[in-house]
Amino acid sequence: MSANNSPPSAQKSVFPATVSAVLPAPSPCSSPKTGLSARLSNGSFSAPSLTNSRGSVHTVSFLLQIGLTRESVTIEAQELSLSAVKDLVCSIVYQKFPECGFFGMYDKILLFRHDMNSENILQLITSADEIHEGDLVEVVLSALATVEDFQIRPHALYVHSYKAPTFCDYCGEMLWGLVRQGLKCEGCGLNYHKRCAFKIPNNCSGVRKRRLSNVSLPGPGLSVPRPLQPECVPLLSEESHTHQEPSKRIPSWSGRPIWMEKMVMCRVKVPHTFAVHSYGRPTICQYCKRLLKGLFRQGMQCKDCKFNCHKRCASKVPRDCLGEVTFNGEPCSVGTDADMPMDIDSSDVNSDGSRGLDDSEEPSPPEDKMFFLDPTDLDVERDEETVKTISPSTSNNIPLMRVVQSIKHTKRRSSTVVKEGWMVHYTSRDNLRKRHYWRLDSKCLTLFQNESGSKYYKEIPLSEILRVSSPQDFTSISQGSNPHCFEIITDTVVYFVGENNGSSSHNPVLAATGVGLDVAQSWEKAIRQALMPVTPQASVCTSPGQGKDHNLATSISVSNCQVQENVDISSVYQIFADEVLGSGQFGIVYGGKHRKTGRDVAIKVIDKMRFPTKQESQLRNEVAILQNLHHPGIVNLECMFETPERVFVVMEKLHGDMLEMILSSEKSRLPERITKFMVTQILVALRNLHFKNIVHCDLKPENVLLASAEPFPQVKLCDFGFARIIGEKSFRRSVVGTPAYLAPEVLRSKGYNRSLDMWSVGVIVYVSLSGTFPFNEDEDINDQIQNAAFMYPPNPWREISSEAIDLINNLLQVKMRKRYSVDKSLSHPWLQDYQTWLDLREFETRIGERYITHESDDARWEIHAYTHNLEYPKHFIMAPNPDDMEEDP
């Protein structure tokens, strides 16, 4: 055998045992286009199969040996070519050995035929004519394949819809939207923004495709198209293949260009230059993949490559900063738009063309809205792999969920201990100094009998502490005792804490027992910070030399149109930092408690530093509207506090929201009876708003709060950050609200009026009764509304009355002039129901206030009950609400 036909010594097995990279097998665009894979994909070729049958006149059967695995294949004789066999090899590797594939494998594999009669058993195949029936063909990797080839592994991306909050694995920012939020790699399962797809490194691990090499493949399983080179295939269109199963989607090969990949690998790896950074959007640490939590300065960001991580993770990040890598003349670094300030524009116009008075436009893109996620929300399943196909009997609409714009946060299971240790104290009632093991958390100060037991002597809720002051009252001290170090003042008793032994030097032994000025001062500082965990303490700045700092912490309380200066919110309310109730347009809502009365409240904390100075008036929009609203169906505003950095809006605290009630129901939807009861209350509250020319603009189940956990609860509207003052014949054009509940005129940037809220009511009725959103984003809203088969599929709409569907149809009218008003909706037969009226009257009697029904209807319903032999209760309260009579039109 000649040297040319012998396998070179440098050749190596195509599947070494130590290969760890997992990679698909793309090949260059210059490879033959008549390969086997194309024919396999359209069915004109029989797929290779494991068979023992003998070849016929029209087929050639032979064995392919790849490493330690043999595959029996059959190919049509007229289609047998060297390129076809190589295509077949690539397909087998792609499915059975993804960890051994690499970029451009097609051009770097050699085929050898086993010839047992030759001294050199392996004979290099240079033509398909050398392959005969029953031959054993060995696949060998060429010496031209380098380590670099194995390191370049492109991702196979397809458009994907996520059912849970998901973050981009490249830049760390959230994937926004309701559907088709980003791209998922079919090989490794990582998720990316579309804008990041051209920047990601070609490092697919292929873990989702990895298959045991000793498992035989079925015949049809090998009919996989050979993908083109990354430079030759554009990204998959968002409009196509979105709702196909992953196995049926055609992946798009994307990532950095190969020339850039080679350039990056040759660069010298340098350490990152980290600096503390504040993020305006939810971002995860790119090292530990956990959320960067907080209001500001949440983490560290590399100044050069924009890598994001926790402060604790910065020291663990590899020294692999790429610097300012450019692509098409633009930086490839991540997070460039996360640093941009929120751009707020003003473009409201009334019907007469005049400018709106306090109507600066909200940030137009929904992505600019700030919100924070609780880590427990990220533990759920990140996505689903399949989507139900459209059929007349099942709905293809999006299941009802808490949209990303208004994530529902849950309270943590346990408070974090802020400080613990031994401390001494006596009180204004008992001057005997006692020693206990103090433990301070975010809600209370507990005095334990010892450091390990669960028995405690006293528990002091932080909400009962009126203030912490320096030592002033020494009248209660026993004779001969050392003075105390600071005082904790509550409504009923004063705690004199610490013992000043007069020593100027630190004594560790005494400090461990709670004696000494330094240990007491550390406790004083910790308690002051715990009293107001979300803002600097005004009470800390007490010395005359700190006048400037004191002014910075001065607050103003606005309550019942009265202005009180130098009022610190921490002296009136206790804010629980670990009890996050939710997030609104401009801030986060925390649970809180009034110190003197113990009343539970909800406190929205707004960070003014995130917005331009000229837009500060917009931050007060919600407060300005709520101050003039006094209605049982609208959340009550107690007061507002303001510092130069923050605004604190104090409101009544309610039990939960309507969305939570819907999702927790047995079928994830509400019965008609309860829906009627709640929708009537919503419409009555809207009637009060519209009478005052106020349009909510962001009505959705998340903003309908429940006062209790009863089956028929009182509901109240909240979150007026988007609300607008719109006259009866006026229009606005500013971008407002949540897209899933918005009317078409807002989504199309056309003028809208108060009928905007009525469209939202229609969506609320729909999602309450069905548990799904009414529209699929893939189709035009007009077409979907006119197609009753898809708008109201039998499951579940066969169980729902035709009157409910009729009301929904009259509310979901694309033309605003045809859309029902509040009064027309309340007069609709679906809501004019005797049982609904009884439920509402029972509720009004229970709370002792009549504001939903009207006394003029009593006679009509009494006649109705008499006519139909129904019971008419006599215990209902009869007096209407005087305020309701004055305000209603």
Swiss-Prot record:
Keyword annotations of the record: ATP-binding, Cytoplasm, Kinase, Magnesium, Membrane, Metal-binding, Nucleotide-binding, Phosphoprotein, Repeat, Serine/threonine-protein kinase, Transferase, Zinc, Zinc-finger
Modification Phosphoserine, positions: 27, 37, 41, 44, 213, 216, 346, 391, 395, 442, 539, 730, 734
Domain Protein kinase: 575-831
Residues noted as binding ATP in the record, renumbered to the chain: 581-589, 604
Listed SUPFAM superfamilies: Cysteine-rich domain, PH domain-like, Protein kinase-like (PK-like)
Ranges annotated as Phorbol-ester/DAG-type zinc finger: 154-204, 271-321
A single GO cellular-component term on record: membrane
InterPro entries: C1-like_sf, DAG/PE-bd, Kinase-like_dom_sf, PE/DAG-bd, PH-like_dom_sf, PH_domain, Prot_kinase_dom, Protein_kinase_ATP_BS
Entry cofactors: Mg(2+)
Post-translational modification Phosphotyrosine, affected residues: 426, 457, 741
Active-site residue list: 698
Residue span of region Disordered: 336-370
Pfam families: C1_1, PH, Pkinase
Location(s), subcellular: Cytoplasm; Membrane
CDD domains, alphabetized: C1_PKD3_rpt1 (cd20841), PH_PKD (cd01239), STKc_PKD (cd14082)
Domain called PH: residue spans: 416-532
Phosphothreonine modifications at: 535
E.C. number: 2.7.11.13
Annotated control of activity: Activated by DAG and phorbol esters. Phorbol-ester/DAG-type domains 1 and 2 bind both DAG and phorbol ester with high affinity and mediate translocation to the cell membrane. Autophosphorylation of Ser-734 and phosphorylation of Ser-730 by PKC relieves auto-inhibition by the PH domain.
General function of this protein: Converts transient diacylglycerol (DAG) signals into prolonged physiological effects, downstream of PKC. Involved in resistance to oxidative stress.
Protein name (database record): Serine/threonine-protein kinase D3
Organism field: Mus musculus (Mouse)
